Swiss-Prot record:
GO terms for cellular component: nucleolus; nucleus. PROSITE patterns: DEAD_ATP_HELICASE, HELICASE_ATP_BIND_1, HELICASE_CTER, Q_MOTIF. It catalyses: ATP + H2O = ADP + phosphate + H(+). This is ATP-dependent RNA helicase DBP7. Its EC number is 3.6.4.13. PANTHER family: RNA HELICASE (PTHR24031). Residues 531-747 form the Helicase C-terminal domain. Belongs to the DEAD box helicase family. DDX31/DBP7 subfamily. GO terms for biological process: ribosome biogenesis; rRNA processing. The gene is DBP7. It comes from Mycosarcoma maydis. It is an enzyme of class 3 (hydrolase).
Length: 974
């Protein structure tokens, strides 16, 4: 794909001022010449005799050691030379002079492994110099190169001030097997499985005409329910069915409206009574695991209760229209807001309340004006996430508090009735049952038991235990779409249905196109940028020529930790293609980016980039979500035309959020918690309610087994004809052409994202220049360098938190830390990063603890004065991407002593004392006493810190003292 076609131009001008730019025609010829010359040089290395490879090197014009083989005459034609190779040899011979004077940096040349040459006046050496690799110095300092390292710490390497500049691509230019690159996978097309049912409408489900009209005219939802709505609404709307409901449906199928519509309709008759207002108290409570999901439900509820209360307001003349009063006011309780303001709203009355568990329990215990004695509805949304985040104790306390308040209110109303006689007890003839108790207004609030609705996309054993504690005689409802648009309600009661539940448990929408890219750790950054550029380009063309809504161009990128989000957010906004390494404005740009709601990138023009993670304030979260969703603000009102945007986030945005028109989800890091369930929740942010979507997963070569043996084996895709299939038929669809996750070629991804002439390696040169732009930004100031180092260390710590079942695929010891550092635009060896990690920890500690931290740093004595440059050159040469970190004495191994001191200071400063260390030792002793330490005696530092942190937070299970940690802030998983 050419740059002129993708609509996203990259400025590949050299940082230093040079001569006039070369014409596009000459650039294309140069790219072809480089491609042909590289292939010819590769054949020369194979055909050259052994004695020719040890020719003494000669000094080149630029002072770079160049082997004599670089000046060899064109190779003679061999006997078995193919026609294609012959054409390449002839073309390379005729254009060798043009190739040698190419102004663009060639990342595959041998001298480029040390430092790239970008000066217009300098000549690039021939790629045939790679035949004498051993004779070349591993790292060469070029004084005249504008890409030379400067301004960074000198402890990383002796050869350059800024570190080691290594190439991204192998010398032969081939990244993967030709079978993957040339045979793209053809995925079978499916009809949407979570789209609204065509053969039914909301009116047939028993919904009030006011709500039917409001959904179609004001909320633009239409009149057709989804499969789960069609299955659940009749049970929730029927006045005689008071059973609790457990709703399970795939993500993006409309579960929020499934429980909000019955709540609003059940309260509409009360609006006909003129003596009832909002002071009646809270009648319905909805619990959500995160602040973002709670606010989203609140916003949907606000739109829902703003419906017209009579048909006359709809310009329809109907006799006998009942007059209703508007007192259904929703309320929101969540962390990050002022409790005094919330108490004022509760004192006035909030009939429908949306809250997070912790804040609701706080008000139940401390707010006396909080009236929940008449509560009729309790909804637990995303129940599996509530349990994973450790809210089980809060949920139990909430249910007990609601039961106690209900009994107190009912007893007080009974005693206030004229027919009440003191001394009576249940069973006596004069005893007034709960169904007959009325308040002073004559309302029988306690005639029906409180209904509990539990919603979840997955039903694991923990959710079933919670359902047993909170639900009474529950009914499990699943919406399954068939050819005839029929829905089925299933209750799991036997072994056969358990198998069916397992098949539906990990179901992805059929219209979601899932792909994965096997990415070497060096190429993670440029591959992410290529995916973003290619999708934005496709969405922009689709918006211009096909559909203005289908190509919205909104992308969500999931990462493993908050430091990684902050680094990529600042790097995309600060990297410039023509910037210098000593740009003094880099620190100011990073500081401005941290304060701004969004940033824009020169690499992805006219597309705002937002971020979202758990360490942001509530106001920053709200601003990011509103900006990404395209809600009209001062900035978005000025934007015209294409409304694409990018959201960089952690797993905090993976559950329940219905962000509008998200067309693509990219997972830079596989989920560290939850496994396949978390993966499905992430990809469920797109392809919602029948819309198309695509998802991309970046995996390292050693992580391919997780895709093949976990995702492919345990995930199903429900097609429109799978409702009538048995479980064995559904499982058999993963074979052959119905593979669920498509392997994609990294070469094609880079080609589409970076552009350039098809059939050449020009995209590799462009990707290298983009990588160098990020590296120049990192070494240009202290703040960018600090962000990159923190992101690298946090990523390694987060990688170590994968569950024991996934350690065979995600083993931190199998990481090539040197190549991984390249993904964070670092030129320093990870050993030196480990030594600098104490400074990172000190920058995040309070001022009162600086002295203690400095004393701890003085005790760290890593051997960082010398670095093994030969090991750097051999391991980081770019010729192979296998992991070498299993070898002892690897130069790219983290300084464990420095990291241990860093983590000790982090844990110690978390609670201001050394209590966490004692708790860590107690946790290890408790685990050893329970028999856990027999098989897992060698716990990682991350696991020990997680035990200590969870102990400090007071979140522990009751199984022999062994702890279960979820979303610990130290590890920045959420």
């Amino acid at each position: 794909m050419d740059d002129n076609d993708d609509g996203l131009m990259l400025n590949f001008a050299a940082p230093a001022a040079g001569s006039a730019s070369v014409s596009s025609k000459r650039s294309k010829q140069t790219a072809k010449a480089r491609f042909a010359q590289k292939r010819t040089a590769h054949q020369l290395r194979k055909q050259a005799p052994k004695q020719n490879r040890s020719v003494a090197p000669i000094e080149s014009v630029q002072g770079v050691v160049t082997p004599a083989s670089a000046r060899l005459s064109p190779a003679p034609a061999s006997a078995n030379e193919s026609p294609a190779a012959k054409r390449q040899r002839i073309e390379a011979t005729s254009t060798s002079s043009a190739a040698l004077s190419a102004p663009r940096f060639d990342p595959r040349s041998e001298t480029a492994k040390s430092a790239p040459i970008t000066s217009r006046s300098s000549q690039t050496t021939s790629s045939a110099a790679s035949s004498s690799r051993k004779a070349i110095a591993p790292v060469t300092k070029l004084a005249g190169s504008s890409f030379a390292s400067a301004g960074a710490s000198s402890s990383a390497s002796k050869q350059t001030n800024g570190g080691i500049v290594s190439t991204l691509f192998p010398a032969h230019g081939v990244l993967e097997d030709s079978s993957i690159a040339l045979t793209p996978f053809q995925r079978k097309a499916y009809h949407p499985t979570n789209a609204p049912s065509v053969g039914s409408d909301f009116a047939s489900c028993g919904l009030d005409p006011l709500l039917v009209y409001h959904l179609a005219s004001k909320m633009n939802i239409g009149s057709n329910p989804t499969a789960i709505q069609k299955a659940a609404l009749p049970h929730l709307l029927h006045p005689g069915l008071d059973r609790d409901i457990l709703i399970q449906a795939q993500t993006g199928s409309g579960k929020t409206l499934t429980y909000l519509l019955p709540i609003v309709q059940s309260l509409l008759p009360l609006c006909e009574e003129s003596f009832i207002d909002r002071s009646v108290g809270t009648l319905a409570i909805v619990l959500a695991p995160t602040r973002e999901l709670a606010r989203q439900i609140y916003e949907v509820l606000e739109k829902l209760v703003s419906l017209a209360l009579s048909l006359k307001e709809q310009n329809q003349e109907v006799e006998g229209t009942v007059r209703r009063t508007r007192w259904l006011v929703p309320g929101l309780l969540s962390g990050g807001s002022t409790k005094n303001h919330e108490k004022q709203r509760l004192r006035k009355g909030c009939p429908i309340l949306v809250s997070t568990p912790g804040r609701l329990l706080d008000h139940l215990q401390n707010t006396s004006s909080f009236d929940v004695g008449k509560c009729r509805w309790l909804v637990l949304d995303e129940a599996d996430r509530l349990l994973e985040m450790g809210f089980e104790e809060q949920l139990t306390g909430i249910v007990r508090a609601l039961d106690g308040r209900r009994n107190l209110a009912c007893t007080a109303a009974r005693q206030a009735m004229p027919a009440y006689q003191e001394g009576t007890a249940p069973g006596d003839a004069d005893w007034i049952p709960d169904a007959d108790v009325m308040d002073t207004l004559g309302m029988a609030w306690w005639a029906h038991a409180r209904r509990v609705v539990l919603c979840s996309a997955t039903l694991d054993e923990h959710v079933q235990v919670l359902a047993g504690k909170t639900l009474v005689n529950p009914k499990i409802i699943r919406g399954v779409k068939s050819d005839a648009a029929e829905t089925s309600t299933q209750v799991t009661t036997d072994a056969d249905s358990t198998l069916q539940k397992r098949a539906v448990k990990f179901a992805a929408p059929a219209q979601l196109a899932q792909s994965f890219v096997t990415t070497p750790p060096k190429l993670r950054l440029v591959t992410l940028l290529s995916l973003l550029r290619s999708y934005i380009s496709r969405a922009r063309r689709q918006w211009q020529h096909v559909d203005h809504q289908a190509g919205a161009g909104r992308v969500i990128v999931f990462m493993s930790c908050t430091d990684s989000v902050d680094f990529h957010y600042a790097a995309f906004g600060g990297a410039r293609m023509n910037a210098s390494e000593n740009d003094a404005s880099a620190d100011v740009q990073v500081q401005d980016a941290q304060l701004a709601t969004h940033v824009t990138s020169e690499l992805i023009p006219d597309v705002p980039i937002y971020r979202l993670h758990g360490s942001m304030t509530q106001q920053e979260r709200i601003s990011s979500l509103k900006g990404f969703s395209g809600i009209r603000t001062k900035h978005s009102a000025e934007r015209q035309g294409f409304q694409g945007s990018i959201l960089l986030c952690t797993s905090v945005a993976s559950r329940g959020l219905d962000l509008p028109e998200v067309g693509c989800v990219i997972q830079l890091d596989p989920p560290t918690e939850g496994g396949i369930e978390e993966y499905l929740h992430r990809v469920g942010r797109t392809a919602r309610v029948g819309r198309a979507g695509e998802s991309w997963l970046l995996v390292l070569p050693q992580e391919l087994g997780w895709v093949e043996h976990v995702l492919e084996s345990h995930m199903t895709i429900q097609s429109s004809d799978s409702a009538s299939c048995s479980c064995s038929e559904i499982e058999s669809k993963k074979q052959g052409s119905t593979r669920k996750i498509t392997p994609a070629s990294i070469e094609l991804v880079l080609q589409q994202g970076m552009g350039g002439t098809m059939g050449t390696l020009e995209y590799q040169s462009r990707a290298t220049e983009v990588q160098l732009a990020f590296e120049r930004w990192v070494i240009s100031g202290e703040r960018p360098s600090l962000l990159a180092r923190k992101a690298f260390l946090s990523h390694v710590r987060a990688y170590a938190t994968h569950s024991a079942e996934e350690k065979q695929y995600f083993n931190v010891r199998a990481l090539h830390l040197g190549h991984l550092a390249k993904a964070f635009a670092l030129r320093e060896a990870p050993r030196s990063l480990g030594a600098k990690s104490s400074a990172i920890g000190a920058s995040s500690t309070p001022a009162s603890s600086h002295e203690t931290t400095n004393k701890k740093r003085m005790r760290i004595a890593p051997d960082t004065a010398e670095s093994d440059s030969s090991s750097d050159s051999s391991d980081d040469a770019g010729s192979d991407y296998e992991s070498h970190s299993n070898k002892k004495g690897d130069a790219f191994e983290l300084d464990k002593a420095a990291l241990a001191k860093l983590t000790e200071s982090i844990v110690a400063n978390a609670d201001g004392s050394n209590r966490s260390k004692k708790l860590a030792r107690e946790a290890q002793k408790a685990a050893a006493a329970a028999g856990v330490a027999d098989d897992k005696a060698k716990q990682t530092d991350a696991e020990a810190r997680m035990y200590a942190k969870v102990r400090a937070l007071g979140k522990m299970s009751k199984k022999h003292g062994v702890l279960g940690a979820h979303a610990a802030d130290e590890f920045q998983i959420a």
